[in-house]
Amino acid sequence: MATHVLAAAAERNAALAPDAPLAPVTMERPVRTDLETSIPKPYMARGLVAPDMDHPNGTPGHVHDNLSVLQQHCAFFDQDDNGIIYPWETYSGLRQIGFNVIASLIMAIVINVALSYPTLPGWIPSPFFPIYLYNIHKAKHGSDSGTYDTEGRYLPMNFENLFSKHARTMPDRLTLGELWSMTEANREAFDIFGWIASKMEWTLLYILARDQDGFLSKEAIRRCYDGSLFEYCAKMQRGAEDKMK
């Protein structure tokens, strides 16, 4: 009887084990098993908010306007709130959050050229390279962290695992080297566009939001996902400009 009980217990433990002994990478990149202590149903994708263990209800004061989290990530750059982001709006948004003229110009061209066509409502390309927020989920690339799903929802579990897997120096922030290692770990076979896009996005975020010690904080990354980081950066830039006057 005792043998059967022990066997059943061992089977249950195996069914819930996050590690596989013959796959060392599963131990090198552990996943969190305590998420439900703070986040209800952390495995369930969120359509409107971007929660984590410290903010189970998302960003305080951030208005979602019934947009998906991926749409919110992009909405700051929709300068006239018409649901379409043109290159000059991308440029303006980048300038507002602190990038210089040359960097903003290059990034605006690259971003809109790369993302415009998948989001168009029809098959005919536009010479103005607009990005339609309504279809932004169609522009999601591979080799990413998996924090957005294919419909633009936010997955708290994948966000938290980003740090349990890759944050080696500090549990709630990443170094540039750790960011690079993360993008390498997320690479999917033959996904050249995804490899490049992922490295470019994380490098730009690091440049924008790193702290004085050279870390990219968990909170900055989370707020990037729901777009509230861009609003914050623009506010800080306006404050700095006002002090210069």
Curated annotation (Swiss-Prot):
Binding residues annotated for Ca(2+), in chain numbering: 78, 80, 82, 89
A single MF term (Gene Ontology): plant seed peroxygenase activity
Location of the EF-hand domain: 65-100
Keywords recorded for this protein, A-Z: Acetylation, Calcium, Endoplasmic reticulum, Heme, Iron, Isopeptide bond, Lipid droplet, Membrane, Metal-binding, Microsome, Oxidoreductase, Ubl conjugation
Class of this enzyme: oxidoreductase
Locations listed in the record: Lipid droplet; Microsome membrane
Residues the record lists as binding heme: 73
Cofactor note: Binds 1 heme b (iron(II)-protoporphyrin IX) group.
InterPro entries per the UniProt record, alphabetical: Caleosin-related
EC numbers for this chain: 1.11.2.3
BP terms from Gene Ontology: seed maturation
Name of a matching Pfam family: Caleosin
Reaction catalysed by this enzyme: RH + ROOH = ROH + ROH
A single cellular component GO annotation: membrane
Superkingdom as given in the UniProt entry: Eukaryota
Chain positions found as N-acetylalanine: 2
Written domain comment of the UniProt record: Transmembrane regions are predicted by sequence analysis tools, but these regions probably constitute hydrophobic domains associated to phospholipids.
Subunit structure: Homodimer.
PANTHER family: PEROXYGENASE 1, PEROXYGENASE 3-RELATED
Record function comment: Calcium-binding peroxygenase involved in the degradation of storage lipid in oil bodies. May be involved in the interaction between oil bodies and vacuoles during seed germination.
Protein name: Peroxygenase
The species this protein was found in: Sesamum indicum
